[in-house]
Amino acid sequence: SDSQTIVLLDKDGILPPLPLPSDTAYHIRRPDQTAFAGCCNEFWWTLPYVAKGLWRGRVTYALDTLNACVRPQLLHMLSWLAGTRTGFAVSAGKSGADLPAYLPAGCWERYLSTYADAEPGHVWAAVFAAATLFLDAAHQTAEALALPVNEAEAEGSLRYLYRVRELPADASEIF
């Protein structure tokens, strides 16, 4: 049963006593090295698909990939960062709604800047906002939890993003 269940009415007194409601089941969980590395890997390896979609003029594909594949990893990282600042004793809330209270100053505003309309230039800005925010949050989280960051993975993905953004529409190769 849900840990936040309360009995509203038991006229016949047949329900067993319930423990007091608690949100501990929803608290941010401390990542181990495998979860942390997996989140970073998924973020850095799916972000280039957004760039390719933009270069090909497929803005809906780019936005879908950004929101469905990349954003969840960014939200994981921001949640873990919040966890390091609260002893992993809080919930991020639905879609990260409670994170502003637990993140460093300016971090939530940076996260909001990763949302874009369908204008390709705005999507590019959101891509780079997401990339820099993720990298900053990953470094802070890794430092707090004594976890390694795969710098080569991040650098390679960023180099690719910058390169694809500058490609002419008729390019036949990337590098």
Q: What is the predicted role of each segment?
A:
Residues 4-35:
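A short, charged helix-loop
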Residues 26-175:
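Conserved nucleotidyltransferase catalytic core and NTase-mimicking acidic/glycine-rich helix/loop elements
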Residues 1:
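Conserved catalytic core of two-metal-ion nucleotidyltransferases
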